[in-house]
């Protein structure tokens, strides 16, 4: 019985190393590919600001409701590189979005 177990193992240690390396690479690749999907399958804005001064905003990204999140999300990229979630129902945020949309149409 011990002999049967030994004969089932590969006799070439180099082949075993290559097979293990390939297995690790495949597992790491699947995990990395799944990581980005997992973050996209939920709302990005857990807390929102009621407003922010427009001079601090570099760009605004409005995400419509979808299978990943049931609410509209407004994500402002600030001039300092940070991102801030804004409340889409806030009158100030609505004006900021309108201003950004109008400036995009005029360019």
From Swiss-Prot:
Subcellular location: Secreted
Modified how: N-terminal processed forms GRO-alpha(4-73), GRO-alpha(5-73) and GRO-alpha(6-73) are produced by proteolytic cleavage after secretion from peripheral blood monocytes.
Any single GO CC term annotated in Swiss-Prot or TrEMBL for this entry: extracellular region
Main location as per UniProt: secreted
Family matches, as InterPro entries: Chemokine_b/g/d, Chemokine_CXC, Chemokine_CXC_CS, Chemokine_IL8-like_dom, CXC_Chemokine_domain, Interleukin_8-like_sf
Signal peptide (residue range): 1-34
One Pfam family recorded for the sequence: IL8
Keywords: Cytokine, Disulfide bond, Growth factor, Inflammatory response, Secreted, Signal
GO biological process: actin cytoskeleton organization; chemotaxis; G protein-coupled receptor signaling pathway; immune response; inflammatory response; intracellular signal transduction; negative regulation of cell population proliferation; nervous system development
Disulphide bridges: 43-69, 45-85
GO MF annotation, one: growth factor activity
Tagged with keyword Secreted: yes
Domain of life assignment: Eukaryota
Function as written in the Swiss-Prot or TrEMBL entry: Has chemotactic activity for neutrophils. May play a role in inflammation and exerts its effects on endothelial cells in an autocrine fashion. In vitro, the processed forms GRO-alpha(4-73), GRO-alpha(5-73) and GRO-alpha(6-73) show a 30-fold higher chemotactic activity.
Family from the record: Belongs to the intercrine alpha (chemokine CxC) family.
UniProt name for this protein: Growth-regulated alpha protein
Biological source species: Homo sapiens
Gene that encodes it: CXCL1
């Amino acid at each position: 019985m011990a002999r049967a177990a030994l004969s089932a193992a590969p006799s070439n240690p180099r082949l075993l190393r290559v097979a293990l390396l390939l297995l690790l690479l495949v597992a790491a690749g699947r995990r990395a590919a799944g990581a980005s999907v997992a973050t996209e399958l939920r709302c990005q804005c857990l807390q929102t600001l009621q407003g922010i001064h427009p001079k601090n905003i570099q760009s605004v990204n409005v995400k419509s409701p979808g299978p990943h999140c049931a609410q509209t999300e407004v994500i402002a990229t600030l001039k300092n590189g940070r991102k801030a979630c804004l409340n889409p129902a806030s009158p100030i945020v609505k004006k900021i979005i309108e201003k950004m949309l109008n400036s995009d149409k005029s360019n």
